[in-house]
């Protein structure tokens, strides 16, 4: 169950578009990927999974945070397995999974500290105008 939001579909569809984008980016042949200015692969994983976990923590209640973490972890493991199986210039790397976990933990920790439910706060700000 989502938080009480005025635009739940907007937030949920946007989150799923982020997921789809992450899956596509992780399964594209490595030579097709744009350069991100020397940012390490592990940093990309940490930031990406941090953003995903924080996004979903913004639209789901705290009781769902463990499920968000598990779902993103499973997604990351499946993607790494597919990278190894697809033979498109990508390879499975257990260190990527570890980086994903760091990102998930960072995102959910930020959500627990203050950023959880951010979508409700944004909607409240737009309601006042």
Which stretches of residues belong to each language-model region?
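Bulky hydrophobic segments
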Residues: 1-94, 101, 105-129
């Amino acid at each position: 169950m989502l938080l009480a939001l005025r635009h739940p579909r907007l937030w949920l569809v946007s989150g799923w578009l982020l997921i789809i984008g992450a899956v596509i980016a992780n399964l594209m042949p490595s030579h097709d990927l744009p350069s991100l200015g020397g940012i390490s692969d592990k940093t990309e994983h940490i930031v990406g999974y941090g953003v995903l976990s924080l996004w979903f923590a913004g639209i789901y209640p705290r009781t769902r945070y463990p499920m968000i973490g598990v779902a993103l972890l499973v997604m990351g493991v499946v993607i790494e397995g597919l990278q190894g199986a697809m033979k498109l210039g990508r390879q499975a790397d257990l260190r990527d999974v570890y980086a994903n976990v760091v990102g998930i933990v960072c995102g959910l920790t930020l959500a627990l500290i203050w950023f959880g439910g951010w979508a409700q706060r944004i909607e409240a700000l737009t309601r006042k105008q």
